[in-house]
Design a protein with these regions (language model features):
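A non-transmembrane, solvent-exposed segment enriched in polar/low-complexity residues
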Residues: 135-334
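Short, well-ordered beta-strand segments enriched in hydrophobic/aromatic residues
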Residues: 50-60
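Bacterial Sec-dependent N-terminal signal peptides
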Residues: 1-25
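Low-complexity, acidic Ser/Thr/Pro/Gly-rich terminal tails and inter-domain linkers that flank the onset
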Residues: 23-48, 80, 84-88
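Short, solvent-exposed, Trp/other aromatic-anchored flexible loops in extracytoplasmic proteins
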Residues: 83-125
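Beta-strand-rich interaction surfaces with strong enrichment in secreted/lumenal proteins
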Residues: 41-43, 91-97, 107-108, 163, ...
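The feature marks short-to-medium sequence segments in extracytoplasmic or secretory-pathway proteins
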Residues: 58-97
């Protein structure tokens, strides 16, 4: 009798344990890619009854954002619709406070146990918030190189003198491939080329939704510095006139920037965004690894000079600033090519 009672109690205990919702919390998940910097999910609660996203929002103070009632999570091909919220009303304008930061909660249907990641899709409109590959496995670091990057572009760049400018005219072709692309992520890529003759020229190309590729083609006059914009991913590179080069854009840079923003005490470390072939491949790799920053004079700070200076005083001030800047460049722990580039741009 005692054995039967004990067996019954054990059976009931196992049943209760199996019927209890398995709650799990994922803190600070990695985000694979995003089309926006407005939203972040620093905490996710998973159970057998719901998936709860704790959302941090960042936007201009006194401007509004909106969460569509048709928002859903996409995991392994299945949609899990928005079922509730706290702190925000779907389909209504949410006005940002003075700080430009706010928090709220979004509740969705439960994800199956073992789900490794999901996409957050705020409806299917072109400009709706989309965050891709939100990790649920506890990963702490991004891979060293984005998936799909050719092996030839994974080698360390060679240091040396800054390549000579090419004074020629030609048709330049830039073949763009988005690494980590998902359909609907972005519609086009834009390149702003600083031309010797025409100032800054804008060139855009539609992204093929099937392959995540685009081609930019334009007339170019001399070596040019260009800025590249693709959704939230922004970078710069140097291009030679008349060349055909391949450009790989790491779309994970958008997700990485969101994750790095969580540590408000630490300056985000620049991560690679652009990988290029071509005449300036090594220079572009060093520039991109530095976040596109160089040591140079800031002529637009508002306190560069005093308008009451005489010509001689102004000249001496500029010379002193340049000498101080050159000394800072010489002592900086960067590659020689980057030091030379900083001097050339100063």
């Amino acid at each position: 009798m005692k054995n039967s009672l004990l067996l019954t109690m054990m059976t009931v205990g196992v049943c209760l344990a199996s019927c209890t919702p398995a709650n799990r919390v994922v803190e600070n998940p990695l985000i694979g890619a995003a089309n926006t910097m407005t939203l972040d999910f620093p905490k996710i609660e998973l159970s057998d009854t719901a998936t709860v996203l704790h959302v941090d929002a960042y936007f201009r103070p006194h401007n509004w954002i909106r969460i569509d009632a048709g928002t859903y999570l996409l995991a392994d091909g299945q949609k899990y619709m928005l079922q509730g919220s706290e702190g925000i009303l779907p389909d209504s304008l949410f006005w940002m406070p003075d700080s430009g930061e706010a928090s709220f909660v979004l509740k969705f249907g439960p994800l199956p146990r073992g789900t490794k990641s999901f996409d957050f899709i705020e409806s299917d409109c072109d400009d709706c918030f989309k965050l891709y590959g939100v990790d649920l496995t506890g990963k702490k670091e991004y891979p060293r190189y984005p998936e799909g990057l050719p092996r030839a572009l994974r080698k360390a760049p060679e240091d040396g003198p800054v390549p000579e400018p090419i004074l020629a005219v030609g048709t330049t072709t830039v073949n763009v491939r988005l690494l980590g692309y998902r359909r609907g992520m972005v519609k086009e890529v834009a390149m702003y080329v600083n031309s010797l003759l025409n100032g800054q020229e804008e060139h855009t190309a539609a992204i093929d939704p099937e392959s995540g590729t685009a081609t930019l083609r334009f007339e170019q006059y001399g070596t040019a510095m260009a800025y590249v914009s693709c959704g939230p991913v922004f970078g710069m590179c140097w291009i030679a006139p008349g060349e055909t080069l391949d450009m790989y854009i790491a779309m994970e840079a958008g997700g990485r920037a969101i994750v790095q923003r969580r540590d408000k005490e630490c300056e985000p470390a620049p991560g690679r965004r652009l990988y290029t072939t071509g005449a300036y491949a090594d220079l572009n790799a060093l520039v991109d690894a530095s976040g596109g920053s160089t040591i140079r004079m800031n002529l637009y700070s508002g306190d560069f000079a005093d308008y009451r200076m005489s010509a001689d005083e102004y000249t001496q001030m500029v010379v002193s600033k340049y000498e101080s800047l050159a000394d800072s460049i010489a002592r900086s722990p960067v590659f020689g090519m980057m030091k030379e580039l900083s001097l050339l741009l100063s």
